[in-house]
Amino acid sequence: MWLQTRMFLLVAVLFGILYGVITGIGTWMGAGSAISYLILAFVFLGIQYLIGPSIVTWTMRVRWVSEREAPELHRMVAELAEKANLPKPKVGISELNIPNAFAFGRTQRDGRVCVTRGIMNLLSRDELRSVLGHELSHIKHRDMAIITLLSAIPMILYWLAWSMMWGGAFGNRRQGGSYAVLIGLGAFLLYFITNLLVLYGSRIREYYADQGSVRLGCKPHHLASALYKLVYGNARFRDKGELKQVEGARAFFLNDPARAWYEVKEL
């Protein structure tokens, strides 16, 4: 119940921030400009929804594997999908050495589950199965659509900040350039804040997925030991190139590489 309340409050805060910024622009520039920004915001959201899976596939270097290539992986995914009453998602292996797993897709029928090379070399079969159960729970709860929707808000605020500060605010800069810069700086600050809020929302959805993995028959201690190994595996990972490459996909990960050292200290 508390998880649901936190998620509801988070969504309300994020959309409240977006509404406040667009209302502020409308008050200063006129309703027509605010409506233009609102339309562009929905266009951005639609584009992200359509091309998001392709971007994740490319960024994470995912290779979709057949049952012949990864029979055990496919078998575990098929069993868990049947228990969850889901269509079997596409199965992929990310050619990254950082140990992690993620799920994405627009709908339950468009679900995709991926594991990295690093996690396959780190976990036992039972631990990997519990992780896959966790990822299928994300698909079951439509978490990817929720996170995609929420992650569009920081992107919109970044574009608003850029437009106000460097784009001339659609030609009104000479009439009130200082106000445009102030609004732009405010939007830029809110961009960072909403980014953190989206990551927090992603962590809340992770708790839901942990519960879902257990409901699918995975043992809690297997999931706990898998998470323990992932935290230490990410903390020890030293390839800065790979870490930079996955920076934009942190909200999709089972374990956030950027927080691994902090989590080690908490263990």
PLM regions and their residue ranges:
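Hydrophobic or amphipathic, alpha-helical segments that drive membrane association/targeting
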Residues: 1-102, 151-203, 207, 217, ...
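Juxtamembrane helix-boundary/capping and inter-helix hinge elements in multi-pass membrane proteins
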Residues: 65, 108-109, 122, 126
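A secondary-structure boundary/capping signal
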Residues: 94, 115-119, 135
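Short alpha-helix carrying the canonical HExxH Zn2+-binding catalytic motif
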Residues: 114, 124-140, 145
